Amino acid sequence: MYSRIKNFINNSLFANNIDNILYMIMLLILSSAVCLKSDYMGALALLFSILTIFKSIFIQTKEKFEFKNYHKAILIFFLIVTLSLFGSTLFSLSFHGYIKTFIYILFFYCSSIFFKDNKNKITPTILFVSFLMSAESIIAIIQNNTGVLEISGWQDTTSINPEEVVSRAYGTLQPYNPNLLAGYLLCGLSSFVYLILNFLSKNKKKIALLFSILFLINLIAIIDTGCRGAYLGFLFFFPCLFLAIIYYVQKKFGGISNIKKRYKNITLAGVIGVLFFILTNPALIKRFESILAFREDSSISFRLNVYESAIKMFLDNPFLGIGVGNQNFREIYGLYMKTGFDALGSYCVPLEIAVESGIFALIAFILFLFLVIKFCLETGLKKDRTGKIETKDRILCLSIILMILATMGHGLFDTIWFRPQVQLLFWINISMLSALKIKIK
């Protein structure tokens, strides 16, 4: 009976077009990030996952899904989160957060299965992401230049002059929040790196120049959000990018001195342009300086107070945490918080994971990130047993490393990463690695 049903489904029009349907849903998920509420994104991610599971059960595919080490690590993380759920004193509230985590992890596995069968969809997907990023960046720059009204108290203005107040752009993402926009744009910043290097490798210099300009626009838009956590993300993103460029130039050309002068001038002009933009904007300079203000800045002082309370929560629940979800966090945080410092989260991704699911969940998540980066480095730097690794595969690995470093760097100072707009884009990026069927020496 099962075989008859399976044969019927495999010969159907639906089965012949299932990958196209799944891809359309994925593009809808990416599109919904810029204009719809989080619930719609979650529903689309769940629909994508259900159809992928249906495909895996009933529709024949050419190759089996390869369960890599980082897939195992994130599964261990999820199992620990499940234990944390059943150990939570507020099960119903924690269950709400658990369902979100379940959808994210399920979506990651299903996206991995999708890209395993559809490697040709990687570049179009990254192109689509870059289009969304560019549109949001242009909107953000317009908002900054026209002076948008603040939706909430986003900046400490007690010790700065009116001309030093940043008009913090927030784009169209919902809920309106400049930190959310910054996290979203930062997560997609590496998409431009992939496209620039990919087109350069094909000697399509004019197209690469176009995406270089869009990269700078995206960079300026992130700066215009005034998000200091994103600025910290830059400290992880750009050193890694520069090291990769130096490594490539040294290997390909024998050193920077052998690069043509016009390419050096273009790079120098881009760097000078961004520095000029920052140095001629006193509001941005003041915003950068405030990072080092610590207790003298009310926003940073608020975060430090939340950190102190969250650390106490972790120390009281070190192994399984309090249970996942910001509703659960807020209820228990009230027992620890300093008066007047209410919060929905700990404002630090590693601390949030430790508080919600315990030290073992944090170790499993860090192991997951380590294994992803390790796989990317091995793929990018070594040859495989079956022959030559494609250049675009190496570039993809670099872009994913940059994405992880940038978002996790931002995550040291904020928990925007847990928002669907950032989280789903994060998982889509990493799931692309499943398309690389490479055996490393």
Regions found by a protein language model. Name each.
Residues I138, N144-G147, D224, F242-E296, ...:
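A membrane-periplasm/extracellular boundary helix in multi-pass inner-membrane enzymes
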Residues F294-E308, K312, D316, L320-S357:
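Long extracytoplasmic/lumenal interhelical loops at the membrane interface
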Residues M26-L30, S49-L51, T82-L83, T123-S167, ...:
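Alpha-helical transmembrane segments of multi-pass inner-membrane proteins
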Residues G358-V372:
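Hydrophobic alpha-helical transmembrane segments
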Residues S38-F58, Y98-F107, L181-L189, L232-P239, ...:
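Membrane-embedded alpha-helical segments of multi-pass membrane proteins
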Residues G87-H96, L173, I223-R228, L412-W417:
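Membrane-interface helix caps and helix-loop-helix hairpins in membrane proteins
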Residues I29-S38, G226-G229, A354-S357, K388, ...:
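Membrane helix-loop boundary segments at the extracytoplasmic
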Residues M1-H96, I113-L127, L195-L209, K252-N265, ...:
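Transmembrane signal-anchor hairpin modules in multi-pass inner-membrane enzymes, especially those
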